[in-house]
Structure formats: structure tokens, C-alpha cells
């Protein structure tokens, strides 16, 4: 009976400890507006993902999305010569999830490993973007420019 009580306490302690660790190392983004996120990144475009695959970058697991791009709002350093992005597989590492064939506004940074999009960048389903912001980004050519 004592052994069962101790094992229950140990399992409870490990569960609480795991939650604390996950919460501590969870993705932590600065409080920025959509425009600030857009200006901070190397590329921003509107399009829909038509291909998804798992890939490994520097021994870490990533998801690779390739897009049909409808409109480019920002493309610093020709990042979009390849219309694909990679994002960390784990959402704790700021990875994002994109549904295939749904329009999204996608932004991120260009690295030697490719175009990286994370949760702290402006990555949002286009239908979830309020009309005011859609109007701004579509009609102001300098919306994403610093």
C-alpha cells in the first residue's frame, strides 16, 4: 500500500514538473502589431500551401510547406525564388501549422537553411485577418516596408 502511494506521488510530481518545463520553454513572442511583424521579416506573401512534407534541417525536425503565391508584399534578398518555407515541427519551438489549400498570409526570415516561418511572424489564415488589415496590406504598397 505504501509503495502504491509513493508511486502515485512520484507520477504526480513528474507530471507537474513536465508541465512547468513545457510552460517555461514555450514559444514566447513579443507583443507586436501585424504591421510590426510584417516589417521585421524578410518576406511576406499571400498564397495557399499545396505541398507539405517533413524534413530535417541541422538534425532538427521541420515541416516544409510549398505555396502557390498569389501576391508578394515583401521579398527582401529574393527569399521567394523558392516558394517554400520550413517551420519547426514542435509548436513549443514556435512552429506553425498551415492547412493545405487555404489562403494564408505568410512571413518569415531567409536563412542559409531556407525560408523560416515561425509563430512570432505574421502567419495567419487570410479569412481570420480583419477586413481593415486586409484592406491596408492590399492597398498600401509600403505597409510591410520599414
Curated annotation (Swiss-Prot):
Annotated tissue distribution: Prismatic layer of shell (at protein level). Expressed primarily in the mantle with highest level in the mantle edge and lower level in the mantle pallium.
Record carries keyword Cell inner membrane: no
Entry keyword set: Secreted, Signal
Main location per the UniProt record: secreted
Localization of this protein: Secreted
CC terms in the record's Gene Ontology section: extracellular region
Span of the signal peptide: 1-26
Annotated InterPro entries: TIMP-like_OB-fold
Zinc keyword on record: no
Protein name, as recorded: Uncharacterized shell protein 6
Taxonomic classification: Eukaryota, Metazoa, Spiralia, Lophotrochozoa, Mollusca
Amino acid at each position: 500500500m505504501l509503495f502504491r502511494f509513493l508511486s502515485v506521488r512520484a507520477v504526480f510530481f513528474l507530471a507537474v514538473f513536465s508541465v512547468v518545463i513545457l510552460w517555461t520553454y514555450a514559444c514566447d513572442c513579443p507583443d507586436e502589431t501585424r504591421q510590426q511583424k510584417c516589417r521585421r521579416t524578410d518576406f511576406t506573401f499571400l498564397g495557399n500551401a499545396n505541398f507539405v512534407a517533413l524534413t530535417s534541417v541541422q538534425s532538427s525536425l521541420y515541416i516544409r510547406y510549398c505555396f502557390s503565391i498569389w501576391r508578394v508584399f515583401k521579398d527582401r534578398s529574393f527569399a521567394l525564388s523558392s516558394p517554400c518555407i520550413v517551420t519547426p515541427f514542435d509548436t513549443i519551438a514556435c512552429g506553425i501549422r498551415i492547412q493545405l489549400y487555404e489562403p494564408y498570409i505568410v512571413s518569415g526570415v531567409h536563412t542559409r537553411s531556407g525560408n523560416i516561418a515561425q509563430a512570432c511572424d505574421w502567419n495567419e489564415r487570410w479569412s481570420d485577418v480583419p477586413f481593415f488589415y486586409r484592406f491596408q496590406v492590399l492597398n498600401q504598397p509600403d505597409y510591410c516596408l520599414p
